[in-house]
Amino acid sequence: MATAVVGDDVYGEDPTVNLLEKRLASLLGKEEGVFFPSGTQSNLSAVMAHCGRGEEIIVGKNYHVYWDEASGASVLAGISLWPVETENDGSISPSTVEGAIKEDDPHHASSRLLCLENTVGGKAISLKKMQDVSETARKNNLSIHLDGARFFNAVTALRCKPEELANCADSVSICLSKGLGTPLGLSLIHI
């Protein structure tokens, strides 16, 4: 580490961070990646990129974004979270998404984002289920964010290519310390 070439990553001057961001984006078939020190920061940035104040996220009631991130989307960004039931494997069914969607109406928050997670509670959600719920979200003009803290665990369990799972979402948070053993860090990958 003492001999590593470093720079100010805020100004894009750290070649190691730049390479990491580009490598992860390429691996997932996405255009860009941004390094964050934590998953909460990465997920919050994604949520704020997809939603405006007064809009809403549809999210599994047991997902990290709803349960463990200190209501950051609501507190810092003015974005509502609409928690929905998940299946036994942690997935959200397409019919659950359709039932939760709110149209533009001045009386309530409009649904703008479906937040998914894979793995959930150590269970990898099948690629087919991820694709089906993503298709439903896209048909209903929802953006999709995947909290992939254990993304590579899911890819390994599903025996799929990283790009296949990443294609189920518009943005993906990938934790580098869970499953890969880095000291810290997350990368937000966006199309």
Outline where the language-model segments fall.
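Conserved N-terminal alpha-helix of the aminotransferase class I/II PLP-enzyme fold
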Residues: M1-G39, K61-N62, Y66-W67, G72
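Glycine-rich loop at the start of a catalytic domain that most often binds anionic cofactors/ligands
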Residues: L27, A46-G54, G72
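Conserved PLP-anchoring active-site segment centered on the Schiff-base-forming lysine
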Residues: A49-W67
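PLP-dependent aminotransferase-class I/II
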Residues: G78-T119, A124-D132
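Catalytic PLP-binding core of fold-type I/II PLP enzymes
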Residues: I125-T156
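Conserved active-site segment immediately N-terminal to the catalytic lysine
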Residues: K161-S177
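Conserved small/polar residues in nucleotide/adenosyl-binding loops
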Residues: I189-I191
